[in-house]
Amino acid sequence: MWENKFAKESLTFDDVLLIPAASDVLPSDVDLSVKLSDKIKLNIPVISAGMDTVTESKMAIAMARQGGLGVIHKNMGVEEQADEVQKVKRSENGVISNPFFLTPEESVYEAEALMGKYRISGVPIVDNQEDRKLIGILTNRDLRFIEDFSIKISDVMTKDNLITAPVGTTLDEAEAILQKHKIEKLPLVENGRLEGLITIKDIEKVLEFPYAAKDEHGRLLAAAAIGTSKDTEIRAQKLVEAGVDALIIDTAHGHSKGVINQVKHIKETYPEITVVAGNVATAEATRALFEAGADVVKVGIGPGSICTTRVVAGVGVPQITAVYDCATEARKHGKAIIADGGIKFSGDIIKALAAGGHAVMLGSLLAGTEESPGATEVFQGRQYKVYRGMGSLGAMEKGSNDRYFQEDKTPRKFVPEGIEGRTAYKGPLQDTIYQLMGGVRAGMGYTGSENLKKLREEAQFTRMGPAGLAESHPHNVQITKESPNYSF
């Protein structure tokens, strides 16, 4: 071991390029879908990071609609995080199998609160919680001129000539009924009992976002981060009850006893849930997490733009080598890895995928979008959004200290492994995703890869030095107009 102390040489994104290959593949024809686990299939290989300035429900909804996945961060209370997951799962459905409902004795105020919280425009009214016999419907139209919100729902709900359909009605059949009767919500009933709901909004969303990433019930996919802290047990339980599709056991060092034990426990308790564990940077760590029960392993120790782990702790593996080493081990288990961190351009995404990643996790590239929860600032006449690492002092004070195994320390004793900063405002997420995936598609065309599996298995790299990197970027010219997919 002593003799091999300096034997390892590692590479990162700026050290390599993909070699062009013979190709009859057009970028517009490539397949970007990827299966991360038995229950998680994405239509683009992109996941938004579980960071408190990157992903809450708004980002997760937008990511899933684009075909990717969002990880709700855990720097919030247990109930609040579960609510964020519920917002994603209820944002659109093919058929809502467990719709919200109220009873006629409840107040209009309660209805208004429910509709506002989940951004829904109406709710079915049933006789009681047990029998759930449909007796009316309450919509925004019924509430339009209400001034006294203390009155009972029974005083304002629509109860005559209710239009319903039987359980099993298809979306096409439902659309015809909704259009015929000029209504927006169609309750599904069986023997008078409310069993489901189809809305015109959900049908429109299916048409608007045909490649959305959804579960078997037609709901958008949602993931959430957990850690190894004292509240992890109840947090995981509440998230599963909220309908989460994947739990991300998110720590700075996944190759540790506490994380491995947590993976075993979570997978044994919730075998139906996809468990993602990390972060790691070696084949040995990847093997340990897969053997513990992880479905997917997340790779990256310190490559992120806001991470200082490598300079504070002196630890890490340059990301291309880390991804390749971990992917080599993952192949033996027939499982997937996620490349997390260090990605600055769309070209880095395809490099990470070609090195063995099934998907990439993005933070800085998405933090400036409209859907991120970071605060908007104006600096020197330009709009920015706040972006910080989960190892920064601010994030650790809000709850991410357990990620860095400092749960028992007071804020004054924290040793941060991240910084707080700002990133340029970019507008809607879909514009950024379009440019990023356009770059990936182009790279797949250059390498003759019609799908991501072929890219992983057959794409070849060449190493380059600093001169090669300088040659790769625009040079000997002054840029006069910003490009939507390049800034340096």
Curated annotation (Swiss-Prot):
Q: Which UniProt keywords apply?
A: CBS domain, GMP biosynthesis, Metal-binding, NAD, Oxidoreductase, Potassium, Purine biosynthesis, Repeat
- Tell me the residue numbers annotated for binding K(+): 302, 304, 307, 471-473
Name the residue ranges with Polar residues bias.
475-488
A Pfam family it matches: CBS
- Key word NAD present: yes
Q: Give binding positions for IMP.
A: 305, 340-342, 363-364, 387-391, 417
Functionally, this protein is described as follows: Catalyzes the conversion of inosine 5'-phosphate (IMP) to xanthosine 5'-phosphate (XMP), the first committed and rate-limiting step in the de novo synthesis of guanine nucleotides, and therefore plays an important role in the regulation of cell growth.
Similarity section: Belongs to the IMPDH/GMPR family.
Q: List the coiled-coil residues.
A: none
Domain named CBS is located at 95-153, 157-216
GO MF, one annotated term: IMP dehydrogenase activity
The scientific name of the source species is: Staphylococcus epidermidis (strain ATCC 35984 / DSM 28319 / BCRC 17069 / CCUG 31568 / BM 3577 / RP62A)
What does UniProt list under activity regulation? Mycophenolic acid (MPA) is a non-competitive inhibitor that prevents formation of the closed enzyme conformation by binding to the same site as the amobile flap. In contrast, mizoribine monophosphate (MZP) is a competitive inhibitor that induces the closed conformation. MPA is a potent inhibitor of mammalian IMPDHs but a poor inhibitor of the bacterial enzymes. MZP is a more potent inhibitor of bacterial IMPDH.
Annotated region Disordered: the residues are: 467-488
Keyword presence, Transport: no
Q: What class of enzyme is it?
A: oxidoreductase
Residues bound to NAD(+) are 250, 300-302
The highest taxon in the source lineage is Bacteria
- Name of this protein: Inosine-5'-monophosphate dehydrogenase
Q: Which cofactors are required for activity?
A: K(+)
